[in-house]
A protein has these predicted regions:
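Glycine-rich phosphate/cofactor-binding loops in nucleotide/flavin-utilizing enzymes
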Residues: 74-122
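General structural signal for alpha-helix termini and helix-helix connectors
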Residues: 34, 38, 70-74, 96
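Charged, glycine-rich active-site and insertion segments that engage polyanionic ligands
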Residues: 45-76, 83
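Amphipathic alpha-helical coiled-coil segments and their boundaries
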Residues: 7, 14, 43-46, 50
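Charged, amphipathic alpha-helical oligomerization/scaffolding segments
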Residues: 13, 17-20, 27, 52, ...
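Flexible internal linker/loop segments at domain or repeat junctions
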Residues: 1, 32-48
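Extended amphipathic alpha-helical segments enriched in small hydrophobics
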Residues: 1-34
Length: 122
């Protein structure tokens, strides 16, 4: 795979996306800690965005691993494939309610469009 230009592009996309997601989560956590240390509530709009940012990670990782599987060809879908094993783990992670991004995306979209927050768990 390392000589395949398509695989190289996917590797670059995956690496950059993973770093972006990681930095977003770290930034969000640091922003929450600033509020906590100052003894002020974390603004609801920020909490709604943080919730979406964390839930969408599984979706983005699944899309990236799907591209990687496609680039791997038939070797990627064999039962002993490490890539397939990771892909299935990511897929399984979406079974947890915290990783189902659709309701969090809908809530964030509504908030961004001026609606009230509907997620009272944030």
């Amino acid at each position: 795979m390392k000589d395949d230009p398509f695989a190289r592009v996917i590797a670059a996309e995956a690496g950059a996306a993973i770093e972006e997601m990681k930095l977003t989560l770290i930034h969000n956590f640091e922003a929450m800690m600033v509020c906590c240390r100052a003894g002020v509530p974390i603004p609801i709009d920020d909490r709604v965005r943080y919730r979406y940012d964390s839930a969408v990670v599984a979706d983005r990782c699944l899309a990236l691993s799907s591209k990687m599987l496609k680039a791997a060809g038939s070797g990627g879908v064999r039962s002993d494939s490490d890539l397939l094993s990771f892909h299935l783990d990511i897929l399984a992670s979406q079974a947890h309610v915290a990783n189902n991004s659709t309701p969090f995306a809908s809530n964030l979209g509504g908030v961004l469009l001026g609606e009230e927050n509907l997620d009272f768990a944030v």
